[in-house]
């Protein structure tokens, strides 16, 4: 069994974004049922429905745990069903929630070496005592059997793999700070119980041949739903950057996500990490219809998929 | 006018704390009306009811803004009524929320040099572009007239002053890591519109003569309500540290906060930064009665005081 809960479906900033007065964010603030609020992207995954691994620690993690009974402590005075945290990148919206998980609670922190380097470079993350929360490097393309803090197998094996992406904004430097790289700075995650195969890829700058081959025939794929069109933030007047500049391919258009997945025979396709500028967030948008007709679901906070 | 909104009333970890299964946290999770949830300590203060300064950027800041209509954007596509953020320390629970305020939105970040040094030492805070969010050092005991980002006076003057405290846990080092110091690492904040005098002191290791003199006759004081008794976390089996070890004086007992304020003639006294182990959080606790009878209010998320 792969049991999966969407803790947050939105991209960095969430929906609504704190400083956005754009129409969609106003609808979310007004509790419009067609524009439900979404926190920042994260999932929890379990092989037994009892012990969970949080994939990406969003800034909203404290609220996300509060809203998710499966993640509430159940034993003793201090405990957690969260056995570990896996990071697919070092962006603010994937690591900030680690600061919520202090309080001397054992769990395992798993990330690739470039992401662990980013944490090492920020002493604030020493709030997680390394003797209690070990930092375990993940090697690209090496299957890694998840275990509970006591060593018991968790029933899931993950395989991290590099996807095209960019370094976090706060770590940009050098002559080409926005270069798209594929070095493990941004990863996708394959998850399997030995039978089913699920993927979590919240950020991806472009589809590649090897990625296409990897995903073909998968049972479940969560994929980068940041932007509907590459220039939507510019056109809406809410930002200066294209999706490509931010390291995200767009959902629509030639070479977009819908296009790229058309012949991949993935059983269940779910968009996640959806920016507040993306009309997919609105249940009554024509873009939502287009995505649905192409076989895509739009994730929402609390969505649960068991496969 | 000093207009003040409590964004969060709880100490670090909030109430309920993510990994606490103690009875009080279970009551909060069960929506017991006598144990309402509280987010991590922060206030917003305004001299005109329209432009706000957030004092301490808690990890819950995104949710706190969402719950506070006064802090919602009102103009254009991107804007905020938040003119600045003032930090009284460099703890995880006072700085993490800065990472929520990215998105190229101008405001001013004000803190003492030791706290700015802690931010400087953590490149993740470069997510706030210094050309858009200037970092302004506050000098101890120097009145500082708050201004809006366009330079307009905000109608409030703050004076930061050192209070006994300790360095953040993640920055502890040396032979006496928990030493109580009074060097500006932890500050209190005096706030005035020229007529009224309010104070915000969410962490204080002990009452001193100069602090007593400063607070005498104040209109409003928010004060460290972390623990009811110094050893309550040890006795409850939920922690190894006393309040003194964490840099917080306790509310009750000889030399405690109630005792220390007994003859200070403060018009309105409000406890804030209340730990989830503190029975003051429970409306039906005898300790709450004792505090009320001594003239203290217990702050809650959304509490608004205009003085």
Swiss-Prot record, chains A, B:
A Pfam family hit = Lactamase_B_2
The annotated pathway is:
Cofactor biosynthesis; pyrroloquinoline quinone biosynthesis
Q: Give the source's domain of life in one word.
A: Bacteria
Query: Would the keyword Transport turn up in this protein's UniProt record?
Result: yes
Q: Does the keyword Transport apply?
A: yes
Write out the entry's keywords from A to Z. Answer: PQQ biosynthesis, Transport
SUPFAM superfamilies in the cross-refs: Metallo-hydrolase/oxidoreductase
Mention one GO biological process in which this protein takes part, according to its record: pyrroloquinoline quinone biosynthetic process
Q: Which InterPro entries match?
A: Metallo-B-lactamas, PQQ_synth_PqqB, RibonucZ/Hydroxyglut_hydro
Functional description taken from the UniProt entry:
May be involved in the transport of PQQ or its precursor to the periplasm.
Q: Which family does it belong to?
A: Belongs to the PqqB family.
Q: What is this protein called?
A: Coenzyme PQQ synthesis protein B
Name the source organism.
Answer: Gluconacetobacter diazotrophicus (strain ATCC 49037 / DSM 5601 / CCUG 37298 / CIP 103539 / LMG 7603 / PAl5)
The UniProt gene name for this protein comes to pqqB
């Amino acid at each position: 069994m792969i049991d999966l809960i969407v803790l947050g479906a939105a991209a960095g900033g969430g929906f609504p974004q704190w400083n956005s007065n754009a129409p969609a964010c106003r609808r979310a603030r007004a509790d419009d049922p067609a524009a439900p609020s979404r926190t920042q992207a994260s999932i929890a995954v379990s092989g037994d429905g009892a012990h969970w691994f949080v994939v990406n620690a969003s800034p909203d993690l404290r609220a996300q745990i509060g809203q998710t009974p499966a993640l509430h402590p159940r034993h003793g005075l201090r405990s957690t069903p969260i056995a570990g945290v896996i990071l697919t990148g070092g962006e603010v919206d994937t690591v900030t929630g680690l600061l919520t998980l202090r309080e001397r609670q054992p769990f395992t922190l798993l990330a690739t070496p470039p992401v662990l380097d980013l944490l090492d470079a920020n002493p604030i993350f020493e709030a997680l005592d390394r003797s209690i929360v070990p930092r375990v490097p993940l090697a690209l393309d090496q299957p890694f059997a998840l275990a509970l803090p006591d060593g018991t197998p968790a029933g899931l094996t993950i395989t991290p793999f590099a996807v095209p992406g960019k370094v976090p904004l706060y770590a940009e430097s050098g002559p080409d700070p926005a270069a798209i790289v594929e070095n493990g700075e941004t990863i996708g995650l394959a998850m399997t119980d030995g039978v089913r195969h699920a993927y979590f890829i919240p950020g991806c700058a472009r589809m590649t041949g090897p990625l296409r081959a990897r995903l073909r025939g998968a049972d479940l794929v969560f994929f980068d739903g940041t932007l509907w069109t590459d220039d939507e933030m510019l056109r809406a007047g809410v930002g200066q950057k294209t999706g490509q500049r931010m390291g995200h391919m767009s959902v629509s258009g030639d070479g977009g996500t819908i296009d790229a997945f058309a012949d991949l025979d993935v059983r269940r396709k779910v968009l996640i990490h959806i920016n507040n500028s993306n009309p997919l967030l609105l249940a009554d948008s024509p873009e939502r219809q287009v995505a649905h007709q192409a076989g895509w679901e739009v994730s929402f906070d609390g969505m649960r998929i068991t496969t």
